[in-house]
A protein has these predicted regions:
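Short alpha-helix carrying the canonical HExxH Zn2+-binding catalytic motif
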Residues: 126-131, 213-214
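Histidine-centered, transition-metal-coordinating active-site segments
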Residues: 3-104, 108-114, 121-122, 154-389
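Short active-site segment of divalent metal-dependent hydrolases/proteases
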Residues: 135-139, 218
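Alpha-helical ligand/cofactor-binding cores
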Residues: 130, 144, 162
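Post-HEXXH active-site segment of zinc metalloproteases
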Residues: 123, 127, 138-155, 228-233
Length: 389
């Protein structure tokens, strides 16, 4: 009978000094293990090993290329400034209204959930989602509309986001992101009448398509919450079909749309679906794409129209919205006339005084724009606050 202190004969102890103290972990094996995991993703998923950068770099030891891009997006000052840029309300005073920063975090979260459900590349979705709005102006789309009218050649925040990550960040070096991420950032925007158009996304990666639809869905979810919280609209004002289909609570709306997109886009997994598809596709006409069911898509499209008519457009047309537009216009004209006030490095990178003025104003937060406007034209910024505490 073996005593409680006996050691089984098959267990052997080695003196510590017989174990090599010079053995070092192979950190590159971490990246290889992560890349190997990507091989189990959908055959339609983007793989980090296939990514390219404008300037080739040695691989990181513990991260895939898309994970590196995600990390690069969150460190620049342009990302940090998003916390003080408007989503809808102009310079909101309440603590809980959505900012541009919380918006991109929600887009990344919704996108990752969809990508996980479809066995696509979550890291790529997250990198695009976090970086897609880096180029937004102060006061949201109000500021964007002003610069689009005043700048030769127009202005769009998605193009400016690409300009930031490829040129303006890091004193002209840019972030050197992969083409997958840059393409997703460039093509995330959705014209008001083309929310669920297949033709608009057929040349995008599935991960970029996920961010595109997640951006719109996150908009609706948190903007409805903000509109209700501020009493700008009442729950009973919302289209009845939308409330019945999506639910009354924020969490219900988010869960409903994520589940519907995953179910409707199941062919993106490459798995056998309920109709018997074997996951193989011939030609562009049968290429899988990210979508909603026709029924819920119609409801969401109608809800989006409602939000434009009852929330977004009225905000832009409000006294505060008009003042915000006037501030952006004033600052652009001011710095275009006096380019010597713009940081020298930015002027050098921008290529022209007009472009430098747009780049400078676009980089401002709401509060900084208000402060600068007060210096240029005292009193102009008075009353430019929306949202209830």
């Amino acid at each position: 009978m073996m005593s409680s202190t006996s050691v089984p004969s098959h267990i052997v102890f080695y003196p510590m000094d017989t174990i090599s103290r010079n053995t070092k972990p192979d950190l590159n094996s971490v990246r290889r293990r992560l890349e190997l995991r990507e091989e189990s993703l959908s055959p339609f998923a983007s793989k980090s090993v296939d990514s390219v950068r404008a300037i080739p770099e040695d691989p990181a030891s513990t991260r895939t290329e898309f994970q590196r891009d995600r990390d690069r997006v969150i460190h620049p000052n342009s990302f940090r400034r998003l916390k003080h840029k408007s989503q809808v309300f102009v310079a909101p005073q309440g603590d809980h209204f959505t900012t541009r920063l919380t918006h991109v975090i929600e887009v990344a979260q919704v996108g990752r959930s969809i990508a996980r459900g479809l066995n696509l590349n979550e890291d790529l979705v997250e990198a695009i989602g976090l970086g897609h709005d880096l180029g937004h102006t102060p006061f949201g789309h109000i500021g964007e509309s002003v610069l689009n009218q005043m700048l030769s050649g127009g202005f769009h925040h998605s193009r400016h986001s690409v300009r930031l990550v490829t040129l303006l960040e890091k004193d002209g070096r840019g972030l050197n992101l992969t083409e997958h991420v840059i393409d997703g950032i460039r093509n995330h925007s959705k014209p008001e009448g083309q929310f669920l158009s297949r033709s608009a996304v057929e040349n995008l990666s599935l991960e970029a398509q996920i961010v595109r639809i997640s951006d719109a869905l996150a908009y609706l979810a948190h903007d409805i919450l903000d509109a209700l919280r501020s009493d700008f609209i009442k729950l009973e004002d919302l289209p009845k079909k939308a409330v019945e289909a999506l639910g009354e609570r924020h969490s219900q709306r988010v869960d409903t749309v994520i589940s519907n997109v995953v179910e409707s886009s199941w062919d993106c997994t490459g798995e056998i679906d309920v109709e018997g598809s074997d996951g193989s596709y011939e030609g562009d006409s049968s290429k899988p794409w990210i979508r909603m069911s026709p029924e819920l898509g119609k409801i969401v499209t109608d809800l989006r129209v409602f939000m434009f008519e009852r929330f977004y457009h009225p905000i832009s047309a409000s006294v505060e919205g008009r003042k915000a537009a006037a501030i952006v216009g004033l600052l652009f004209e001011h710095f275009n006339r006096k380019p010597e006030l713009i940081p020298a490095k930015l002027r050098e990178l921008s290529g022209s005084d007009e472009r430098a003025a747009a780049d400078y104003v676009c980089g401002m937060t709401d509060n900084y724009a208000l402060m600068m406007a007060e210096q240029v034209k005292p009193g102009l910024s008075a009353g430019v606050f929306q949202g209830r505490i």
